[in-house]
Amino acid sequence: MVELGFPAYGPAIEKRVRPLYKALCDWRAAVTLAARRRFQQLRCNANMDDDGQPMFPPLPVPDWNNPSTDWRPSPPRSGPKKDFCGDLPAPLTSGPRLTTPSSGRMSELPHTTSSPRSSPRPRGPETSPSNEHIIISPPRNPPSNTTHRNVGHVSRSPSSSSSSSSSSSPSSSSLIVLSSPSSSRSPSPSPPRPRADSSSRPRRGRGSNRGGRSGPQSKGRKASPRTRKLEDEDYLPQETANRRGGGRPRGRPPKSGRAVQRNDIQVTSSSGLADTSPYDLCGSVWWEVPLPPPGRCWFGGLGGHRQALTDSPEIVEAIHRFNTSHGPVPVYVEEMKDYAKQYDALVNSLFHKSMKVNPLNWMHHGKLSPADAALNHIYVQKFQSSYDSPGAAVTGTVNRCIPHIAGAMKERKLLWAFPHIAASIAMTRRYCKDQKTFLFRSLKKAYASMAFPDNSSETEKGISSKPSTSPSVLITTSTQTTASPHAPKIDVTAIHGRVYQSVVDLSRCLADGSLDDPEFSFAGCTRPDCCVEEFDAARPLEELADACVLACDSVVAALLCGPDGPHRVAKMLSFYDSRITPHVPDSQQWEKCRILLVSWYNELSDLRAAVYGAYGNTPTSQHLDERALAARVVSLIAETIGPLVRQDPDRAWVRMGSRDITSLLLRDWRGTNDGDPGLVKAKHLRRTAELLNDGRSSKGTYGVFAPPRRPDQLFRGPGRPRRSTSSSQSASDKSPIKSTHRHTSDPIPISTPRPERDPAGTPHENTMSGPVQPAANGHSCSSTPTPAKKGNKTSSDTISLKDPTKTRIKASAKAQTDETLPETSTAHPSAMDQSSSLERKTLYTGPAVSSKERRRSAQSSTPSDIGGVSRKRKSAPEQYKQGLQTPLPMPEPSVGQTLLDPTTTTHDILSSSLPNRSCSSSPSPSKRPYHPSCYSPTDIMTGALVGPRGRQDRAAFRQFPVGTVIGQTPPQSVLNAYCPNGAFVELVEFARIPEPWQEVLRYSPEAMADIARVANALPGKYNSNEIITSAASEAFHTATSKLRARTAWMRYQQESPDDVSIVVLYSPLPGEHLFCVPAPDTPPGGLKFDNKRGGLSFLLAAFSNRLCLPKSSAWAGRWKAAPDISPLTRMGVLFLSTEDLGYQGAVEYLQRQCMKRKKKLIIMDTVEDRYRLPNGPCIIEEATRYMKCIISPRSQCCVRWPGLRDFGTTIITSRDVVGPLTLMDLEQYYYCEIGIEDSTINLCCTGNVRYTVETRLEDVSCVPTTPLFYFAAVKHVRPDFLCGETYSNRAARKWGLCAPLRPIYVIESKMNAIVSPSFLHPTARNLCRSVILPPDPEARPVVVHIPEGTCSALAEDMVASIRSSCITWGQHEEGGPETTAQENSDIRAMKVRPPTKPPYMSPLNIGNRDTTFTD
């Protein structure tokens, strides 16, 4: 109809013509696309290419919008009549330029304003979104001399509209470019006419086809600069796109989320969502990603696939781990199927830093568990590194944690490309660490609006205001609350600004005296919707002030309910600005500012709702800025109204009207005998209302705002540090029980140096003369030379060992190896002397002496020389030669083993007389200058070693920190102990104390005395032919073992005192030790379970959120090696026992260091007064956050009431017993001292401690095991849980073997106050009977607190979420739906059925704005 001259505008014509025109365009595009696909399938030669000639001539593009006023219908077409499918018409004079297929460049033609034959459309700047020219550009090099003209029209003028869209076939070799011509000199368009149905119809004339590009260039062809500029049209800013003919008027950017129409297909402009059109935002056609065949998975390039290993047990276990995990798995395989979950977890981790490590490092080379490492090995060996793999070079992913890119391409999720690009940045070596961090931050900023489209405006605002902050932080800390989708957002920043400005205005009015004006009315910054009539003038001013006080308290209570804790809330409330602090106004001045109090009351009410709403269902650390601003508002208002309430909130608390009514509402009226409960309730409420009405009429006080539960909790919350109560301490210490049999304890930590070897490979024959002192390893060594007696003949002839026997001590699997010592042992050479005299054999442990120096010494020194002794090795005793045929080994010390074997100590430990100090000869270079055995422990403790000049600076003596002492003060007698610096150095070297902890022992002279006592443990002088007895050997072995055990805490916990943040003091049971298993003081019958005194086992059980039973892994009697507490060590926790060497000086030294750093040391003291040492450490308030609690086995209900099976997994806890409450207080202290931004800790979770015990799988196993480790030993056993740990096949397959159950904690008001289960709430008893919590190494403890008098319905609502966490079994798992738990193998198992009713939403979690009250 347009060709025949009919007008191309108007509602009637457009309504009939436009659908036909669109159908014609769609049909032509479909035919062209099908023809090109068929051409690609039927071409014989791969180099054969299309000539690029379109199948149809271009259609005229009518202007459906408002045309120009001087438009006239074009006359009928004249000239030669051409066939519809014939050759192309003559060149159009209005076409700006042409596409040259041979060269890929655009031919430019002169612009014209009319084209009567080929362009009957009127002039206008707007283009139609549906009437488009189809231009087919060849994908490869066409014949060189072929040129087609007039195949496309693209405007060159910046003012013209050059919108285009592209579509292509699935094959990458074809391309369809859609473009439309436009006039370059048309007048500016008039605004479009409003239409009634404009909301339902697509918007026209707004440049719908903006930013088109001509598609990718052919292989081997270089695009012109103009073509590249057109291709990048969509990636330019809005102003540049408008300037380049984007079709949208300047100065009017598109609205966010508006749908852009291309070929009548809606494309949402938020790229994070799935795109429903076959075109992307650039106008290009999406790739067709075919699904892999059945039984195969995506692999390699686009369309590639591999065999799926669905039957492999490793894959099955990996799928189970993936389905149960909440975060991204480190190894993802396509058999897991749910790539959307992995992508979302990766994106969330990259934005919110939930991996606690650098995301780039984690993606590139993150640590893998054994199960994940095995899975990755299978994947690499079978597919990625195989020779027959077609996609060995292209795998479709960057790292093992990222799914194949085909899933993102098929789902059209542009956001899922973020992990691929981030992993590519992490993998490259072209950038340093800082440069990679910059690139990663720029990626996060680019993808922030895509990942969080709802917060795009806040994100842009935050990025512009804080350039250095990452988008993820800005998104999570926006100034708008996200309480509920139905509630309006409360702007906390605006509230803070209004309150701050109102306080400034009030201070200014007080300063200039305007408040004294009788006609003054406050006109400062107040709430816009505030009305003073809300509180009429008849109400007293004090009531408004009290209402503000209670409102302040409600905000403080809301802050205390959050994740910050009392100390951080107190730090927030400590905001003080002296510049705005107002003067003190009187009551008359406050009467003129009543509207200010009303405004503040409303602001505080909104703040309370905003703080509670920001928490959501679970309190998190997000919205920290909102809570900080809310705390500042409370601080400002409280300081301002403080003089009005006389700095005392008691007057607000005496308004008990609301409390009286609330207490009546909470009462249970069903148990009354006065008649109908409803009538009785109404009677009491009416009586209370009458009393309140009488008080109001007499200008009494009545309730304005419901106060908190306890008035004394204003500006105070849970978790305050407690001081230890002063009590009498028993003077008698419990003497340790000495063992009569050997224990595999840890010997003294000194390794014997290897003897130097000559080039032949034999050890040097180093001998030592003079008095021999006990070395650290139990062998004898010389310290100072003594003059030889006249007539003492020694042989100078020696026979060296040609084949010395060397042995290596094999560490037992039940013991822990010492990482600081070498594994190989020192050879024990034996020399046979040809002389008849028998001299005792000595082993040289001093510095190595070269053979040349030894020969020179042997030649210059003869046996007859005075003061000189032969350095040649003497022969072994006759008893040695007759008793043993081979030389005995000298074992290396290691944790869990003894230094001296009973069969070797008799002949290996040799000693002599004490050193002669009057020796005139100087010691040789091969001898130690002084031995610590010369120092007496009594002299150290009494201070007899103090020199005439007094105490030295580097000496060891007690130095109490100055401050207020907590608990008992150590006696003054401990201050007399003194150890000189020289003796300190030798004793520390003797005990092999780690260098970072040597400075700590300078504050503990008691430790020096203990080391000197061990050094003097060997017997005294004896003749040369004597061999020390077995009793002396055993005594020395016991002393060295205990010393090694007492110094183990310095080796296997913190590397340096600077890493200590929390100190836990405890008193172990006899036989308990944290690092030496079994301990040196283990009783002959082994450890005995004590249900009255808790030791190390119960302490570690509290930190690992588990039970401690006699047959559980937590009991020290079952340990085969030291428990693994490395997670607690990484958190800065240091366990100190009262039996550890130098624990007094360690506590005092750490306090001094914390005072220097202006921080406080967190101390958790679990030592009872009867087991406390009289010379214990001095603890002061100024340097510590001190917490006193005890370890009580009776907290476990199975220990307190052994006959009740309903409470087998229940623990009653309080703040006086080590448990979740005390550990949460420690976490709050930790956050106050370290800071929540630096790190987060979880002191009460199963993953904190791992035990090495004997299981049914192996004699020595580290539990809890991983499910994959147990998968190889499947065995159907019952029950599911034995002694509080997983035992059955299905339980171990799900959580691993010996994974502990999570106990249920019930709060006890006072220690041992619950003497019978009947004292517990019935709902708590039912909960403990019917709920078993599954093992979870990362889960927080579950604490049940049901106040007295709580009705059953409310109590059931409080524990509904706990019931939903009960263990449930799926239908595919073996066994029934019941969970069986057994305390031990001697009693009957208890069966617990899963909950039948689904959990429901608690009314306690509904916010104030979600509740509607109607009359």
Swiss-Prot record:
GO terms (BP aspect): DNA-templated viral transcription; positive regulation of DNA-templated transcription
Q: What is its main location?
A: host cell
Show the GO cellular component annotation of the record.
host cell nucleus
Per UniProt, the keywords (alphabetical) are: Activator, DNA-binding, Early protein, Host nucleus, Phosphoprotein, Transcription, Transcription regulation
Disulphide-bonded residues: none
Q: Where is the composition biased (Basic residues)?
A: 245-255
Top-level taxon of origin:
Viruses
Entry comment on modification after translation: A long stretch of serine residues may be a major site of phosphorylation.
Tell me the GO molecular function terms: DNA binding
Q: Which Pfam families match?
A: Herpes_ICP4_C, Herpes_ICP4_N
> From start to end residue, where is composition biased (Polar residues)?
96-105, 263-272, 465-480, 814-837, 895-910
Positions of the region Disordered? 48-272, 454-480, 691-935, 1371-1415
The record's annotation in InterPro entries points to: Herpes_ICP4_C, Herpes_ICP4_N
Where does the UniProt annotation locate this protein? Host nucleus
Q: Where is the composition biased (Low complexity)?
A: 125-187, 724-738, 911-933
Sequence similarity: Belongs to the herpesviridae ICP4 family.
Role summary: This IE protein is a multifunctional protein capable of migrating to the nucleus, binding to DNA, trans-activating other viral genes, and autoregulating its own synthesis. It is required for the switch from immediate-early to early mode of gene expression.
Its recorded name reads Major viral transcription factor ICP4 homolog
Name the gene for this chain: ICP4
